[in-house]
């Protein structure tokens, strides 16, 4: 049986090539594993920043159980308003930032890919030089097989793969740009909200003592219900003697059959498009009450005059219509369909 009888250096060279290929295969596997681990870390980071349940309203309810002084209530009101503004700003800002960042990342990815392709080069003379060096080594060390096997093999330079996604790698310039863009969006959003809050609206309300007495005042969208009741009290005192000794804490504001807490602002209902049992809470113009119209199904965005009521009157008459329909406002409760009973 014929056998191949080549130089001993050929066997050594073959072993070198086998070891070289094995090392390259191991490096490739390590690179794949590292990319998979980095992608998993990125996924875990994204999950940590997912939206979570906002418990601000629940905390306010639990902290205002029982009698609370006016100063404490004002402090809690201010803290709640600031917290709500931050949450709304963060939510709106996150949406706008995500869109802009995706566009920027796509643009940078394409530019980086073009740059890497342009810089990627392979030297054709490198292979020839390596072959010449190996031939010289074979001629000089034919009888020293083991020593030849241990000689280091010159590695070819591996070019970078332009298709690999490197967006998850740390990049100080990119992070600074994202932070700057995020801050600009936040400031722009806050300016828009302040402009909305400063806009003036006309509030039509009815002082309710068993019958309605309609009045109108002008307020700003950023004003709270407490500020509105203070203004309404100034208007009503000259016509109703029972209100001359009353304070804001003795009054209730009823809008669409819901008892609205004093710390809420008109802005809160406008930006969230909140709805009540019998109409929207974000409209303050007046339409006919649907309970006095033949077809109650035509009501959509029509609003009714809110009622200003003394707490003492409500406690005496809460079992009688319309007070029997009133219930405390709950921001978590949805009134997608209006009711008239």
UniProtKB/Swiss-Prot annotation:
<dbReference type="GO" id="GO:0006325">
    <property type="term" value="P:chromatin organization"/>
</dbReference>
<feature type="compositionally biased region" description="Basic and acidic residues">
    <location>
        <begin position="80"/>
        <end position="115"/>
    </location>
</feature>
<feature type="region of interest" description="Disordered">
    <location>
        <begin position="80"/>
        <end position="147"/>
    </location>
</feature>
<dbReference type="GO" id="GO:0048701">
    <property type="term" value="P:embryonic cranial skeleton morphogenesis"/>
</dbReference>
<keyword id="KW-0507">mRNA processing</keyword>
<feature type="region of interest" description="Disordered">
    <location>
        <begin position="1"/>
        <end position="27"/>
    </location>
</feature>
<keyword id="KW-0539">Nucleus</keyword>
<dbReference type="InterPro" id="IPR007005">
    <property type="entry name" value="XAP5"/>
</dbReference>
<feature type="compositionally biased region" description="Acidic residues">
    <location>
        <begin position="125"/>
        <end position="147"/>
    </location>
</feature>
<keyword id="KW-0508">mRNA splicing</keyword>
<comment type="similarity">
    <text>Belongs to the FAM50 family.</text>
</comment>
<dbReference type="GO" id="GO:0008380">
    <property type="term" value="P:RNA splicing"/>
</dbReference>
<dbReference type="GO" id="GO:0005634">
    <property type="term" value="C:nucleus"/>
</dbReference>
<dbReference type="GO" id="GO:0006397">
    <property type="term" value="P:mRNA processing"/>
</dbReference>
<comment type="function">
    <text>Probably involved in the regulation of pre-mRNA splicing.</text>
</comment>
<dbReference type="GO" id="GO:0048024">
    <property type="term" value="P:regulation of mRNA splicing, via spliceosome"/>
</dbReference>
<protein>
    <recommendedName>
        <fullName>Protein FAM50A</fullName>
    </recommendedName>
</protein>
<dbReference type="InterPro" id="IPR048337">
    <property type="entry name" value="FAM50A/XAP5_C"/>
</dbReference>
<dbReference type="Pfam" id="PF04921">
    <property type="entry name" value="XAP5"/>
</dbReference>
<dbReference type="GO" id="GO:0007417">
    <property type="term" value="P:central nervous system development"/>
</dbReference>
């Amino acid at each position: 049986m014929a056998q191949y009888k080549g130089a001993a250096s050929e066997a050594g060279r073959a072993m070198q090539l086998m070891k070289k290929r094995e090392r390259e295969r191991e490096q490739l596997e390590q690179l794949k594993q590292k990319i998979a681990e980095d992608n998993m870390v990125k996924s875990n980071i994204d999950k940590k920043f997912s939206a979570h349940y906002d418990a601000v309203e629940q905390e306010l309810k639990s902290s205002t159980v029982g009698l609370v002084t006016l100063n404490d209530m004002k402090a809690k009101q201010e803290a709640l308003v600031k917290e709500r503004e931050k949450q709304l700003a963060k939510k709106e800002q996150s949406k706008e930032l995500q869109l802009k960042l995706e566009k920027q990342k796509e643009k940078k990815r394409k530019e980086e890919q073009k740059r890497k392709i342009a810089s990627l080069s392979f030297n054709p003379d490198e292979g020839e030089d390596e072959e010449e060096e190996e031939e010289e080594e074979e001629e000089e060390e034919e009888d020293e097989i083991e020593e030849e096997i241990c000689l280091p093999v010159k590695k070819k330079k591996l070019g970078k793969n332009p298709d690999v996604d490197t967006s998850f790698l740390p990049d100080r310039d990119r992070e600074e740009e994202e932070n700057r863009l995020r801050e600009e969006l936040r400031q722009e959003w806050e300016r828009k909200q302040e402009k909305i809050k400063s806009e003036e609206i006309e509030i039509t309300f009815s002082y309710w003592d068993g019958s309605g007495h309609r009045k109108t005042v002008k307020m700003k969208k950023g004003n709270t219900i407490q500020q509105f009741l203070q203004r309404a009290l100034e208007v009503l005192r000259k016509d109703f003697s029972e209100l001359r000794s009353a304070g804001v804490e003795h009054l209730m504001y009823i809008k669409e059959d819901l008892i609205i807490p004093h710390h809420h602002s008109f802005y809160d209902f406008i930006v969230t498009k909140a709805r009540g049992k019998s109409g929207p809470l974000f409209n303050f113009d007046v339409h006919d009450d649907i309970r006095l119209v033949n077809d109650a199904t035509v009501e959509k965005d029509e609003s009714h005059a809110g009622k200003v009521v003394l707490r003492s009157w409500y406690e005496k008459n809460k079992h009688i219509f319309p007070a029997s329909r009133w219930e405390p406002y709950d921001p978590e409760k949805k009134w997608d369909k209006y009711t008239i009973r």
